[in-house]
């Protein structure tokens, strides 16, 4: 008789089995092609609570589990001023996926809302700075962000039409403000539609059947 698998195990299995071609393969290609993970790295996987960062966290867990290269992971959640419902949702999804998150509070929303500058731009800048700082405090040398293939294309196209110069979103980037820190984007080759398809496993009652197929 087949042993009943837990929801988290089914979701993890789906990454390696059902969505191997769409998720696992492009993830591994990006990690190897751009040399995103090195022996001895301590990587802060930055989780916003959305589908992209949650998938990234599971992929990084699977990589650590199967890799011959030793490295450490910290799963970092910056609370910019979430309401209680949003924070609880992040915590419950992380628990479902067996992701041991570390949450730290900031005042990003409050500062951005009281600024004359674009709130979205300011939020993004402040968020990244806080993530770098906290990751460094925890002894990490890298932060991983959940930008995917479509984000990369959109950023490039937007800079062509609205920017004064062509700007790309590289797969890795050395920080100029935090010495010894590097930003990596493990989902660089993963497409948004495939992430959406996988994320349905978290919200449907047919997750077990989907993951086994």
Feature annotation, model-predicted:
Residues 171-190:
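Short, flexible loop segments at boundaries between secondary-structure elements
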Residues 203-211:
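Conserved small/polar residues in nucleotide/adenosyl-binding loops
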Residues 167:
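CoA-thioester-processing core
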